[in-house]
Amino acid sequence: MRLPLVDPSLDLLHNRRRLIDVRAPVEFAQGSLPGAVNLPLMDNEERHRVGIAYAEQGQDAAIALGKQLVDGGIKRARMTAWQQEIAAHPDALIYCFRGGLRSETAQQWLWEAGIERPRIRGGWKAMRKLICNHVDAASERPMLVISGLTGSAKTPLINNLEQGLDLEGCARHKGSAFGRHPLPAPCQIDFEHAMGMGLLNQQQPQGPTVVEDESRHIGAANVPLIFWRGMEKAPRVRVEMPLDWRLAQIRKDYIDDLWTLYQRQYGDWLGWALMRKQLSTALVRLRKRLGLARLQRLQRLQTLAFREHERGNRHAHEAWLGPLLTEYYDPLYRYQLEKHPQTFLHVGDWDSCLAFARDWSARHAA
């Protein structure tokens, strides 16, 4: 009996096919495919024991041990999980690390139960190679970088573009000391896969890309080197907005939106405690650059703002966010501009930069 195979393809991701990952949970946590659900053939301990048997006694002994470990009630439970997933997603595909014995075993068991589903040839490894190649290829196509002072709403601008790629969204981090997301950051592989999906979801997946001006490190994630080099040589647009506008935007980003996320994830009491801890810790991390006296002044203002926030006055945060912009972020940005002079295709307010980026994308369409 030759069990069906499908070739690895980005279309499987773009079309949001349900993928059943039969690797162990520890492998899944180290990097998964977008849209995949982890329904393992073996759990972490079983995989570990089979791996030892393979190393010490060879493949036949490892296979025999695997059959012994995953039998009876354990086998029935895992079969049930696969059957339920396929009932909910009849077009689901199966994969393991290389599309070999584990996914073939799952296929075989399902076939014996009257269910035929293909596995992906080459498995996770082949699909990851396609995603990474797609990300690298984007650096060879036209790319535009959106720059500007902190609070210029660059990320919302990116998300208003059909060819935009939100790197901060992929990293689940806003790229600054205050940018940590309440949910855990993705691992490096999942960050790269999120970039790949972002590119696939563009109106023209083979067209130009517009990104925000970022350092290569966004939180714990690193922008892939080839893509980063494409960003470095790409033309730039600079958003210029007045201080009061940027202050309102930064309050929305660092306070209003962050509170919504914490409240939704953890509830009022714990969410408030965790948000306060994040913001106060982030401020302390800037001690070296702010200096002790300035840090202590901002800490006092931040503490007062927290009290006012509890009374319903979120605008009070502008008392410490304002100096943070004018005394830290703005001078830092201007220093970087002086150190690395840049030529901008366009400099203007948010609306004009959005219009320019849309026009640029249309002119560079594939």
Language-model segments: what does each one mean?
Residues 116-132, 139, 251:
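Long, charge-dense
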Residues 66-120:
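Catalytic cysteine-centered active loop of the rhodanese-like fold, especially the PTP/DSP P-loop
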Residues 162-231:
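Conserved nucleotide-sensing/catalytic segment adjacent to the nucleotide-binding pocket
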Residues 13-86:
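Positively charged, proline/Ser/Thr-rich regional signature most characteristic
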Residues 230-366:
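Conserved NTP phosphate-binding and transfer environment spanning the P-loop NTPase/kinase superfamily
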